[in-house]
């Protein structure tokens, strides 16, 4: 998905900002891997909710920081799950890149990337896809009439998190210099290529989730 976002954003900005967009997308993937390894995977899917004395905070996991997979489960499936979590952390972070294109310094964007992939996105994953109180997979008490929430493909977990962060960032930064004077258009061919790549990257997850739901109904 990083490739899709990169092409979509490159096609949407002025040509002089192409290199900046590409560097930020590559940086997203790299910093997401580091932060997901250091703290993200533990906050998202750590062993239990033991940040409080009752053991029930329902918002973040803990334990096993600086890890790729659980020490009790090093199967290929667990490793694939870690890889999947890392790619979605990077994807959620990259959503903001397009929203503030041509308006943010690289240092400011780097700081945001560290915070979102390490400390904002992982608790959302825990609440929606882990053992958090929003999750339908939780064995204990759940919100929404004890039904919880099922997010098959990340529309809430990934895209809503990135979208809210993008709205906040765009609102804080404001319009670009020179607005409303139009800048030279980007390249529509890259926009189309990016959209097609994102479609292909996204289509497998909903199909697999739907198949699982049907098999357990």
Positions of PLM-derived features:
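Hydrophobic alpha-helical transmembrane bundles of multi-pass membrane proteins
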Residues: 1-217
